[in-house]
């Protein structure tokens, strides 16, 4: 099983979701951005690194919200979700197709990656 971290970034009562790249597993699904934890890396350091790489922003991690396991024929992961806030104003996407700031009540109107839809209840 691979550990993955995801940032649930909240700003002005909206949450940031990003659309997965067309070449990735679950292409065009929406997700809370993040990525794989490297060997000997803490979840928090991995999350800060991934968000800087993918969105070009620095984040402040507030607390862990939940963990969800997902397995299919291609992947076997445990995703660790952290509530965060952005410390920057401008987001520059490097890996995603698109991004949106969405109210909690509207999150489930998007096709979310597995696991991400399950944690909406914790927000």
Each language-model region and where it sits:
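The catalytic Nudix box helix
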Residues: 32-64, 103
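Conserved hydrophobic "DFG−1" position in protein kinase catalytic cores
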Residues: 9-10, 17, 84, 101
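Short coil/turn segments
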Residues: 20-22, 112
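Active-site-adjacent beta-strand/loop module that shapes the phosphate/pyrophosphate-binding cleft
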Residues: 3, 58, 68-90, 100, ...
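Short, charged/polar surface micro-motifs in flexible loops or helix N-caps
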Residues: 10-14, 23, 38, 86-89
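NUDIX/MutT-family hydrolases
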Residues: 83, 92-122
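A conserved beta-turn-beta hairpin within the catalytic core of GNAT-like acetyltransferases
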Residues: 24-28
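Conserved N-terminal beta-strand and adjoining loop/helix that marks the start
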Residues: 1-16, 36
């Amino acid at each position: 099983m691979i550990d993955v971290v995801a940032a649930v970034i909240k700003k002005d009562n909206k949450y940031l979701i990003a659309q997965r790249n067309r070449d990735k597993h679950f292409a065009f699904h929406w997700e809370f951005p993040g990525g794989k934890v490297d060997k000997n890396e803490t979840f928090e350091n991995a999350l800060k690194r991934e968000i800087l790489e993918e969105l070009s922003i620095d984040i402040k991690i507030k607390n862990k919200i939940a963990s969800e396991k997902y397995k299919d024929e291609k992947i076997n992961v445990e995703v660790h979700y952290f509530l965060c806030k952005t410390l920057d104003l401008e987001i520059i996407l490097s890996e995603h197709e698109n991004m949106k700031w969405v109210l909690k009540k509207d999150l489930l109107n998007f096709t979310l990656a597995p696991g991400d839809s399950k944690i909406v209840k914790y927000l």
